[in-house]
Design a protein with these regions (language model features):
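The feature encodes the CheY-like receiver
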Residues: 72, 100
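Charged docking surfaces used in two-component/phosphorelay signaling
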Residues: 31-39
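C-terminal output helix
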Residues: 120-129
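Disordered, acidic interdomain junction associated with two-component signaling
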Residues: 1-19
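Conserved acidic carboxylate
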Residues: 24, 48
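Active-site beta3 strand of CheY-like receiver
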Residues: 60-66, 71
Length: 135
């Protein structure tokens, strides 16, 4: 019995009917999210900045947003506020490398529903997504 495969299988969710908008401008982070989310069967939409995220949100039915906060053109805080103005019930999970004191509170004030500090561990990502997508 291969324990590593069992753990990996436990992490894999089946979200074939779900749409996740990933807002990320750093290629290495995009690769992580792509690899992590591919096996969930969720449809993944990509935005490279906050303005593109707001536009994509308006044009698509989205179940959850993974929002980087430090973005070009429009930051993640502003994009979060604009998306929440459109749909207050959409879960938005902040993901940021800024882990200074007060950062979580700043995210929540902007309207984020949860917060992930980079580097993000796969188990924590899946647990957090499950909390919102398995309702």
């Amino acid at each position: 019995m291969n324990t590593a495969n069992n753990v990996t299988s436990a992490l894999i969710q089946d979200w074939e009917s779900k749409v996740i908008l990933v807002v990320e401008d750093v290629d290495t982070n995009k690769i992580f999210f792509d690899a992590a989310l591919r096996k969930t069967k969720a449809k993944i939409l990509w935005a490279k900045d906050g303005l593109e995220a707001v536009n994509m949100f308006q044009e698509n039915i989205v179940d959850l947003v993974l929002m980087d906060l430090q973005l070009p053109i429009m930051d993640g805080y502003t994009a979060t506020r604009q998306i929440k103005a459109i749909n207050p019930s959409i879960p938005i999970i902040a993901q940021t490398a800024h882990v200074m004191s007060g950062e979580r509170e700043k995210c929540m004030e902007a309207g984020c529903d949860d917060y992930l500090a980079k580097p993000i561990r796969l188990q924590i990502l899946m647990d957090t997504l499950s909390k919102f997508l398995n309702k």
